[in-house]
C-alpha cells in the first residue's frame, strides 16, 4: 500500500500537468480563433495600427468596445475554452492508449496547436512582412515630396466643404447584392466622380485615411523618444498638410465630427494642422445636443447621428459663408461604422428587421441625408465660390453586410465632387494620397507638376504614381529616417 504523502504528491503533479496542458492548448486555440475574428471585425490591421491605437486611444475606445465584446466572448474566448477542453481530453486518450504512434501523437499535438495558432495570428497582423521590411531600402525617402519645399501656383480661391463618410464604398450601389442601389439618392444631385478611387496602402482606418488624404502620407507607429509631450505640436509636427497650407493662405479650418475627438489622436492631428475650430462628441454634449435616452435624441452611443451632424453643419456653413473669409469645412460622419452602425431615430422604418436590413437602412439614410445637404448647398447658391467633396474614408469592414462586400473583387471608395471643374478625359486610378494635391487644387493652389507628398492631382493625367505607391511597404516606414522626421520635426 502506497504512502499517503506519495499519493498526494503524485496527484498534485498530475493535476499540474493537466492544467499546464490545458493552458498550452488554450493558448494555441485562442490565437487560432482570434485571427479570423480580427479579420472579420477589423479587416487586416498591421502591427503599426495596433500599436498606434494603444498609444493614442486615450480611453475613448471604451465607449465603443461593448459592441465587440459579445462576439469576442463567444467566437474567441468561449470557443477556445471548449476546444482546449476537447483537445486536453483527446490528449489524455492518446496518452493512455497503447502503441508508439499514440504516444508520439500525444507529444506532437501541443506544439502543433500552439505553433499553428500563433502562426495564424502573426500572419493576420503581417508580422513576418513587418520583420523583413526593416532590411529594405528607404523607398519613402525616394518618393516623398515635401509640400513645404514646393512653390504652389496660386489661382482663384474657392471655399471647400469636405465630407468624410464612414466606410462608404461604391459597392453599396450593387443592386445584385443588395436588391437596390443604397446610394441612389446621391446619384440624383449632379457632380462628378473619379472612376477608380481606392484606399491607399495602410489607409483603411479612419485616422490613417485622414492623414493620407490631407497629408499625402501613410500613418504608422512612431518612437516615443521623437514625440515629446511637451512639444507645441505633437502629431506629425514635421509634416505639412492640407489644413496647414489653407491656414497659411488665410482660410478658416473648421472640423465637425460626431465621434469623440480623443479617439485615435484625431483631435491632436486636427489641432496641430490648422483646424482652429473642432467639434466632437463632448463639445456637442456641452453645447446642448440631446443625449441618448431623451426625446428625439441627437446623440447615439458613439456620438452624434449623421442627420443631426449635417443639420448643425448647415447652420455653421451659413455663418462661415456670410463672414466672407475663405473656409474649409470638414465633416466626418459615423452612422455607418462597424459592427452594426447607428440608426438615427429619425431614419427608422417599421419594416426594419434583423441586423442586415437595419444596416441597409442606415446606409440608405446617410445617403439620403447627404443628398439633402448637397441640394441645400446648391439651392443657397454656395457653389458659386465653394466646392463640395464627399468621399468615403475607407472601405467597410466587419459590418452586417461584410460577406456581400467581400464577394466583390474590386472595391472602390465612394467619391463625389460637386462644383469642381471637369476631370481629364482619361483619369488614372487614384488612391487616398492623391486626394491631398487634388483637394488643394480645388481651392485654387496647384503644385507645378500636380505632385505633393506621395500623391498626384486628379488634374495631372500624365503624372505617374510615386515609387512608394507602386511598391508600398508599410512596415519599412518604421526604419525610414525621412518618415521619422515627420514625427520629430527635425529636418536633420
Question: Which residues fall in each region the model found?
Answer:
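Transmembrane and membrane-interface helices of multi-pass
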Residues: 1-133
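Alpha-helical transmembrane signal-anchor/signal-peptide segments
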Residues: 128-144
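Solvent-exposed soluble domains appended to multi-pass membrane proteins
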Residues: 146-492
